[in-house]
Design a protein with these regions (language model features):
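Non-catalytic terminal extensions that flank enzyme cores
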Residues: 1-44
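His/Glu-based metal-binding/catalytic segments typifying zinc-dependent metallopeptidases
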Residues: 37-39, 46-48, 157, 161, ...
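M16 family metallopeptidases and their MPP-like homologs
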Residues: 42-52, 78-126, 133-142, 169-194, ...
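Active-site His/Glu-centered metal-binding helix of metallohydrolases
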Residues: 59, 63-67, 571
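Generic recognition of flexible, low-complexity loop/linker segments
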Residues: 91, 205-209, 265-267, 324-329, ...
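Hydrophobic, small-residue-rich alpha-helical packing segments that form membrane-like cores
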Residues: 142-235, 242-266, 271-273, 278
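Non-catalytic, conformational "gating/processing" segments within enzyme and secreted inhibitor domains
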Residues: 205-236, 715-750, 938-939
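Extended, regular secondary-structure scaffolds
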Residues: 218, 227-245, 366, 446-449, ...
Length: 965
């Protein structure tokens, strides 16, 4: 069978993807296409190139950014951004892996999907990639004047500076490289900031020429779109190429016969005295799908639960505070396993290594408990059947899975067809074969291809790196002639002029986009009924969930005093991680994994529409197959009514884990920390969120880590107070998502859960008013900054209108993108508006600047005043806003979204009104919003998380300074 030059190689019906999978080969070029035909309306496409680098200059990563900066058919500066501005896309991005670069798109709108695919195809095969693009996205030297200092700039350069500021990222990179010393995985495909400036434009261009060819491409389609059109989209591009050999093969790393130990410094704070260690093993090839499934289950057995033997041994050892390491890494040709401890005392790495090996030896010798095996099998099988890819489209998850073999010229269908390997593994286990004990010996105990990677703290490293970079640039400056200096200034000015020059109307018109007429005028409501069961208020959502029941029960936090709020997240964790009077935490975790798809508790905070009062809940959520609904509700009742808070050692471990997790996430997620901090200054719900997950929470957890040692009785008493204040039937809400039959069958179990809850009454406490906001710098040992400025626009007199969503989205994708990312060199910038509370924040991500970015924020009003918005730009902004409103949600997320709307009184009629206001947005709304942004500039509050640049700005302006790491 041949169509559009493609020949069918293989076809299979796969229940695992609910459809047909076809492998096609393009005869003229050798390009392969994996075409999945099923009923998923969230259509997905991807083009993947094998791109193993030969150095750590980040060439593949910089090229990934750059091909999306203009192409032959779409000659605008950033078609990627134009698509983001005005598409109904459900996914639009690109990824650089150690050996491949992927360009995936997804949309539930057919015409929009075709538009995205065409722009991406032109981008990857016929990109502009001129020298200015390379300088902007990769690196360049910036000089404002012939006498002034030189600076390295570039989006990827600053992105990777941020990566190398995170100890977790550094440890992960060194762990991978330590196992692959002889091939491409021993390099950094993302780019090492110290090496990136060695990349030349010539080498950059050559990499595209050699790797971005159909002969080196794997195409992927997924969804309910007609297959014939898939070929028609690809054919015009492939017709311009002929087959050729591409030097992109990824070899196997030869097996090492001697373990390695490597030690590296990392940038710690002034008080940082803790190290990190990871033990790493090279394991099987991804082509061995049966063995890979064994390793996935073994990972769950060893680490998947709080009471898993290796996790438990490491945490209870007291050698560190939390696990580190990626576990099983499956994105490369050869998999590897990594596990270790964060925050160890320097010099104790060998103790950690010995403990890991002894624990594994004990399991191999004495056997893996049968209950742990059952839990692992159930958990892995549940995940496979649920196919819950979260924020990623299911098609994208399938594409990544297929590439595990396909990229290396293996069978792309095998990783998708998991039913037979699963059945075979179950049969082996049923026969009594010691599958996991044998795997422990084979891959861990008898495997000499392993490494120990140690990170040691260095409080001077960040400053030394800055000084080394400054000295390098000074030497370069000193070596330049006067004419060279002038030329460098001219090049800087030319790049800025190019960045600031608008695209022509003709070029912009070439970008395909939807019209307002293509947009649905009505919102699609989520099914919801309200009822009671056992005196418990119940929300039910009749949605096809493929036989899975999702359940969440929520309890108000209104009666919790402010001083106890930071204890709520750990109290929630305690429900499922400390055991009950019937079973200890190991037994409870194993039972949960055997009977359900998971259960956990966490806070939920939002703002009530109109009243601007907080909605704060503790949410216990779980999921199970329909036939195990009784187990799900029985276990929910058990943890809610019988959780055991007496285990001091276990609770102390949880506190230390929480502290380590918070500290390690500060730098990688600095923008989130800044947004949370700004919202806390301007809304009561924001203040509660900060107490439950921000810097205030980190400070409270640090204090708690001392108190569990010095005054456990008071901590135990506080946990009991929280139990009494929170876990009762009063105002509790049960949220259920499943098909109608499953919902009906669950009613008796829901009623029993309601009856099991205490009937105590808690009195809501009045909330203290917000204090005066303060400008502040939060100092961390990072080479980049996260710069924020925020306010509450309702306090400034603004009344909500749906056009605000259109305007802030336009600012994010236009003004801030151009000024902060393109010209400023930051990795990203956001304009975040919470319509319920009124808090607005402009925040940057991995930003080399502070003052310049703040000046951009303050100039937003002037930008809006002068904005000459074309009809096209207005339409794009409206289309993009509707895309946000209609974001594609998997079944469980639809039920959760309906719950959130119910709790905040975000009614369907009001959401429809907002939709109409979005669709009716005009230029006048942009002009009027300029005055809101002018007030935001005048009255807003600054929060910057960063290193020396943040400290210098804070000192100059008299901001409050706090060292948080």
């Amino acid at each position: 069978m041949n169509t559009h030059g493609f020949t069918l190689v293989r076809e299979e019906q796969l229940s695992e993807v609910s459809g047909t999978v076809k492998l096609w080969r393009h005869e003229a070029t050798g390009a392969e296409l994996l075409s999945v035909l099923n009923g998923d309306e969230n259509k997905c496409f991807g083009a993947t190139f094998r791109t193993p680098p030969k150095d750590s200059t980040g060439v593949a990563h910089i090229l990934e950014h750059s091909v999306l900066c203009g192409s032959e058919k779409y000659p605008v500066k950033e078609p990627f951004v134009e698509l983001l501005k005005g598409s109904l896309q459900t996914f639009l991005n690109a990824f650089t892996f150690p050996d491949k670069t992927c360009y995936p798109v997804a949309s539930a709108n057919l015409q929009d999907f075709y538009n995205l695919v065409d722009v991406y195809l032109d981008a990857v095969f016929f990109p502009r990639i001129d020298e200015k693009c390379f300088q902007q996205e990769g690196w360049h030297i910036e000089a404002d004047s012939a006498e002034g200092p030189l600076r390295y700039k570039g989006v990827v350069y600053n992105e990777m500076k941020g990566v190398y500021s995170s100890p977790d990222s550094v440890l992960a990179e060194h762990s991978q490289q330590s196992l692959f010393p002889d091939m491409t995985y021993g390099l950094d495909s993302g780019g090492n900031p110290e090496v990136i400036p060695q990349l030349t434009y010539k080498a950059f261009k050559a990499f595209h020429e050699s790797h971005y060819h159909p002969s080196n491409t794997r195409f992927f389609f997924w969804g309910d779109d007609p297959e014939e059109r898939r070929f028609a989209l690809l054919a015009p591009y492939l017709s311009r190429f002929t087959a050729r050999e591409t030097d992109s093969a990824v070899p196997l790393q030869p097996r090492l016969d001697v373990p390695r130990q490597l030690e590296f410094p990392y940038a710690a704070g002034e008080d940082g005295d803790k190290g990190h260690v990871a033990l790493n093993w090279l394991t099987c090839e991804t082509a061995d799908t049966g063995e890979l499934l064994v390793l996935e289950m073994l990972e769950h057995i060893l680490l998947g639960l709080p009471g898993s033997p290796l996790r438990k041994a490491l945490i209870e050892s007291g050698l560190g505070e939390d696990l580190t390491g990626s576990g099983l890494e499956t994105d490369l040709r050869q998999t590897f396993f990594s596990v270790g401890l964060r925050s160890i005392v320097p010099g104790t790495a060998e103790d950690v290594e010995m403990l890991i090996m002894e624990t594994l030896a004990d399991l191999a010798e004495n056997g893996v408990p049968a209950a742990a095996v059952e839990a692992a099998v159930n958990s892995v099988e549940f995940d496979l059947r649920e196919n819950n890819s979260g924020r990623f489209p299911r098609g994208l998850a399938a594409m990544i899975r297929s590439l595990a073999t396909w990229l290396y010229d293996g069978d792309p269908i095998a990783p998708l067809a998991w039913e037979k390997p699963l059945a075979a593994l179950k049969a082996r286990l049923a026969s009594g074969e010691k599958v996991f004990e044998d795997a422990i010996r084979r891959w861990f105990l008898d495997n000499e291809h392993r490494s120990t990677v140690i990170l040691t703290p260095d409080a001077n490293l960040a400053a030394e790196r800055e000084a080394a970079e400054a000295a390098k640039l000074q030497r370069l400056y000193d070596a330049l002639s006067d004419d060279d200096h002038k030329e460098l200034v001219a090049l800087t000015e030319a790049l800025r002029a190019s960045q600031q020059a608008p695209d022509s109307p003709e070029a912009l018109a070439a970008i395909p986009s939807l019209t307002l007429g293509d947009l649905p005028r009505e919102n699609t409501p989520i099914p919801k009924t309200e009822d009671t069961a056992g005196d418990l208020a119940v929300l039910a959502h009749d949605i096809d969930t493929s036989g899975i029941l999702y359940a969440e029960i929520l309890f108000p936090l209104d009666a919790v005093p402010a001083e106890l709020l930071p204890l709520v997240p750990l109290m929630g964790r305690s429900l499922t991680e400390m055991g009950t009077s019937k079973r200890n935490f190991v037994e409870l975790g194993t039972l949960l994994a055997s009977k359900t798809g998971g259960m956990d508790a966490s806070p939920l905070v939002a703002t009530l529409r109109g009243a601007r009062t907080p909605v704060a809940k503790l949410c216990l959520g779980g999921k199970a197959t329909a036939d195990k609904a009784d187990d799900l509700f029985a276990l929910m009742a058990e943890v809610l009514t019988d959780a055991d808070f007496d285990n001091r050692q276990r609770f102390t471990q949880m506190v230390l884990e929480e502290r380590a997790r918070l500290e390690q996430s500060l730098i990688p997620s600095g923008h989130g920390t800044v947004i949370t901090r700004l919202r806390a200054a301007y809304s009561l719900s924001g203040r509660i969120s900060e107490a439950l997950g921000g810097v205030t929470y980190l400070e409270a957890i640090r204090a708690l880590s001392d108190r569990v040692v010095s005054d456990w009785d008071s901590v135990r008493a506080d946990l009991e107070i929280l139990r009494g204040l929170i876990l009762n039937r009063q105002d509790a809400v049960l949220n259920l998502t499943a098909d109608a039959k499953t919902l009906a069958a669950a009613q008796p179990y829901a009623a029993a859960l309601g009856r099991a809850l205490p009937t105590a009454f808690s009195v809501p406490l009045p909330l203290d008013p917000l204090g005066a906001p303060i400008n502040e710098a939060l100092l961390v040992p990072a080479q980049v900054n996260y710069v924020g400025k925020g306010c509450n626009i309702y306090d400034l007199g603004y009344n909500w209108h749906g056009s605000a969503h259109v305007i802030t989205r336009h600012l994010r994708m236009g003004w801030l993108w151009d000024q902060v990312r393109v010209q400023g060199g930051a990795y990203g910038a956001f304009c975040s508006l919470d319509r319920m509370s009124g808090t607005l924040a402009q925040v940057s991500y991995r930003d080399p600047n502070v003052e310049k970015t703040l000046a951009t924020y303050d100039a937003t009003a002037d930008y809006l005043r002068k904005l000459d918005l074309s009809d096209r730009d207005l339409t794009l902004a409206i289309v993009g806003a509707i895309g946000d409103l209609d974001t594609y949600l998997l079944p469980d997320a639809r039920g959760a979204a309906s719950l959130a709307r119910h709790l905040t009184d975000d009614r369907d009629d009001l959401r429809q009104q907002m939709r109409e206001e979005i669709l009716g947005t005009t230029r006048r709304h942009f002009t009027e919003f300029a005055e809101v942004m002018a007030e935001a500039a005048r009255a807003g509050t600054v929060c910057v998380l960063g290193g020396s640049a943040a400290e210098n700005a804070a000192t100059a302006h008299g901001w409050n300074i706090s060292k948080v790491l």
